[in-house]
């Protein structure tokens, strides 16, 4: 069976991680897989998209991302339309039609692909886009109205719709009123559970052997307790909460000197996006004024190898977004025996077991800090929670189970076209 994936931008986010994992698993089940995208930067992508594991085709890079800082959504629609056209054109030109096309993030291309191909189209909804761009003025509402209508109508054109969590499923039903009757299936993302774990000491050595990570290795070595935030440098991710929680601990604890906890804030960063550049500057400025400034390290666009080493070094992971649609980071952390402290809303409510594999707390500095203190004051508890976390991920969120599920959804959809 021939399966194509259509994704707008192959960066370093959770949606991209899902797409890469899904494509790899479908390919592992014996199907021919090809990925089409509107952007693929070899310096800001997952390794599988750049080492030959996946067959990646890029189109529409010549199109602008915005017009004078405006019209981002319309530009994204047009760029994705070019990607969809290339997908359809190459399939027709090579006389190798696709059986199923998997689309995510930009539903606009769903009806186009149905028009230009004979493939069955599966749409994976990470979260309704219209809720991510709440209109602030009457003019903005007028601008968003046709975009929101297109999103809802285009989503409904898919032959099958999958969502990433029960939380997103509920939001989908209340947001897309005209699609309330449409059946959706929850397919949670998954992570690799490593067979063996890297010790903290080995992780230090791994960082030290990389000339680009000398400072990182030194920072991690001097931290008796290291907390790690893994998220894109975007305002909606609430990274300032991690900084504020660390500052709260520094100001409200009797411990001082080298025994004070440290924090690494790492994640994807796109210097082309003005809002992200501005947010990054605000975070740096905020930390420069903090009492805990020497105990924080910012890292942009870390490699998977560095990320895994940081996970091995840390005491726990801080996951700061509120009402996150799903959140792959908690799974990545728990798979490596690290408890997670997250906000008590959205997707993490489905993945983290409170006081067993981590803590689900209010999104305020004191609540996060108290959970952090519970782990630093009792290392054996942190280790025990980590072991439970790994078992939890193995049982419910393994890559193998995810692969079987996504493959079955695609196979079932392909069979429908023959009935």
What do the PLM-derived regions correspond to, one by one?
Residues 267, 277-305:
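Nucleotide-activated donor-binding/catalytic signature segment of Leloir-type glycosyltransferases, i.e.
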Residues 339-342, 352:
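Short hydrophobic beta-strand element within catalytic cores of glycosyltransferases
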Residues 129, 140-161:
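Membrane-proximal helix-turn-helix segments that form the acceptor-binding/catalytic region
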Residues 4, 208-237, 243-248, 263-265:
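Conserved donor-binding/catalytic core segment of Leloir-type glycosyltransferases
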Residues 354-355, 359-366, 374-379:
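Conserved acidic donor-binding segment of nucleotide-sugar-dependent glycosyltransferases
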Residues 167, 190:
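Carbohydrate-associated surface elements
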Residues 5-12, 24-76, 168, 271:
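N-terminal strand-loop element at the rim of the active site
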